[in-house]
């Protein structure tokens, strides 16, 4: 999960700031929660 957070912080935030002309990092939407669901039963 740390890899995803680092990627978002380092790459995605920069792209969003340039795409939407944000003046501050605090204006960029942040990821609050990621939920994964995987079924392992027989289909």
Swiss-Prot record:
Cellular-component GO terms for this entry: ribonucleoprotein complex; ribosome
Gene3D superfamilies: 3.30.1440.10
Statement: the UniProt record of this protein carries the keyword Nuclease: no
Highest taxon in the source lineage: Bacteria
Entry's Gene Ontology molecular function annotations: rRNA binding; tRNA binding
InterPro entries, sorted: Ribosomal_uL5_dom_sf
Keyword set, alphabetical order: Ribonucleoprotein, Ribosomal protein, RNA-binding, rRNA-binding, tRNA-binding
Family: Belongs to the universal ribosomal protein uL5 family.
Function: This is one of the proteins that bind and probably mediate the attachment of the 5S RNA into the large ribosomal subunit, where it forms part of the central protuberance. In the 70S ribosome it contacts protein S13 of the 30S subunit (bridge B1b), connecting the 2 subunits; this bridge is implicated in subunit movement. Contacts the P site tRNA; the 5S rRNA and some of its associated proteins might help stabilize positioning of ribosome-bound tRNAs.
Description of how the protein assembles with itself and partners: Part of the 50S ribosomal subunit; part of the 5S rRNA/L5/L18/L25 subcomplex. Contacts the 5S rRNA and the P site tRNA. Forms a bridge to the 30S subunit in the 70S ribosome.
Protein name according to UniProt: Large ribosomal subunit protein uL5
Taxonomic lineage from the root: Bacteria, Pseudomonadati, Pseudomonadota, Gammaproteobacteria, Enterobacterales
Gene name per UniProt: rplE
């Amino acid at each position: 999960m740390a890899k995803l957070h680092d990627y978002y912080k380092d790459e995605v935030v920069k792209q969003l700031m340039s795409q939407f002309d944000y003046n501050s990092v605090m204006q960029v939407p942040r990821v609050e929660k990621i939920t994964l669901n995987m079924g392992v039963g027989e289909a």
